[in-house]
């Protein structure tokens, strides 16, 4: 894919800024808005295809436990009897009912869950459960990016506090020099009368 910066360079290098080339700018901007530059930290990558490596692993579902085996039919039955009830409320009710069951009532569902887990291990011997990462950190890192990715590189988004303090110190120092340059010069040479008054006051 042609990068946004190279596309802009090719557009402005053409004679007369052809309209056909200019029409491609919004499309390139939209496509490039989903991709960070290579200088982004690997911890906060925002590329749209970042999760492609684990896509095959994520498609494999976890084997059902005893509660899931039991609640399949119960959830469907409760949803039909209470069509206006929310899923969260249904889950709470099913959890309460599951706790009220005796061990003898739960045992058949534990046996079925063990069979399903054994079949799952045979079918996917290299399967490892990996909980999904929260997308909050990715959203925060992507929100720091500018609207136009070519204007400011990703590495400049994360400010360096030390450099920021140095810049503020330099700016303050330059302002003070500018203000001192406009002040009238101080006459350090005093007249003989003033020196006599000062020496007389010190003797007293």
UniProtKB/Swiss-Prot annotation:
GO MF annotation: an example: DNA-binding transcription activator activity, RNA polymerase II-specific
Keyword Nucleus on entry: yes
Matching CDD domains: HMG-box_SoxA_SRY (cd22034)
GO cellular component: cytoplasm; nuclear speck; nucleus
Keywords in alphabetical order: Acetylation, Activator, Calmodulin-binding, Cytoplasm, Differentiation, DNA-binding, Nucleus, Repressor, Sexual differentiation, Transcription, Transcription regulation
Record-annotated DNA-binding residue ranges: 60-128
Subcellular location: Nucleus speckle; Cytoplasm; Nucleus
Post-translational modification: Acetylation of Lys-136 contributes to its nuclear localization and enhances its interaction with KPNB1. Deacetylated by HDAC3.
Annotated region described as Disordered, given as residue ranges: 175-204
Domain of life per record: Eukaryota
Family annotation (InterPro entries): HMG_box_dom, HMG_box_dom_sf, SRY, SRY-related_HMG-box_TF-like
GO biological process, one term: positive regulation of transcription by RNA polymerase II
Basic and acidic residues composition-biased segments: 194-204
Pfam families: HMG_box
Keyword check for Cytoplasm: yes
PROSITE patterns the UniProt entry points to: HMG_BOX_2
PANTHER family, per the entry: SEX-DETERMINING REGION Y PROTEIN, SOX TRANSCRIPTION FACTOR
Record text on subunit structure and interactions: Interacts with CALM, EP300, HDAC3, KPNB1, ZNF208 isoform KRAB-O, PARP1, SLC9A3R2 and WT1. The interaction with EP300 modulates its DNA-binding activity. The interaction with KPNB1 is sensitive to dissociation by Ran in the GTP-bound form. Interaction with PARP1 impaired its DNA-binding activity.
Similarity annotation: Belongs to the SRY family.
Function: Transcriptional regulator that controls a genetic switch in male development. It is necessary and sufficient for initiating male sex determination by directing the development of supporting cell precursors (pre-Sertoli cells) as Sertoli rather than granulosa cells. Involved in different aspects of gene regulation including promoter activation or repression. Binds to the DNA consensus sequence 5'-[AT]AACAA[AT]-3'. SRY HMG box recognizes DNA by partial intercalation in the minor groove and promotes DNA bending. Also involved in pre-mRNA splicing.
Protein name as it appears in the record: Sex-determining region Y protein
Gene responsible for this protein: SRY
């Amino acid at each position: 894919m042609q990068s946004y910066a190279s596309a802009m360079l090719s557009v402005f290098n053409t004679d007369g800024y052809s309209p056909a080339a200019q029409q491609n700018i919004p499309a390139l901007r939209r496509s490039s808005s989903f991709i960070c530059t290579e200088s982004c930290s690997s911890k906060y990558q925002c590329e749209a295809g970042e999760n492609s490596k684990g896509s095959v692993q994520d498609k494999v579902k976890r084997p059902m436990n005893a509660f899931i085996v039991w609640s399949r039919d119960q959830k469907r039955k409760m949803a039909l009897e209470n069509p206006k009830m929310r899923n969260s409320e249904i889950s709470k009710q099913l959890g309460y009912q599951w706790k009220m069951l005796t061990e003898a009532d739960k045992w058949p569902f534990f046996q079925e869950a063990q069979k399903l887990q054994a079949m799952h291990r045979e079918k996917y011997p290299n399967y490892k459960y990996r909980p999904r990462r929260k997308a909050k950190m990715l959203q925060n890192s992507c929100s720091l990016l500018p609207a136009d990715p070519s204007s400011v590189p990703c590495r400049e988004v994360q400010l360096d506090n030390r450099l920021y303090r140095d810049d503020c110190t330099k700016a303050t120092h330059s302002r003070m020099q500018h203000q001192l340059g406009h002040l009238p010069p101080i006459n350090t040479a005093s007249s003989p009368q003033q020196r006599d008054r000062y020496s007389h006051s010190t003797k007293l």
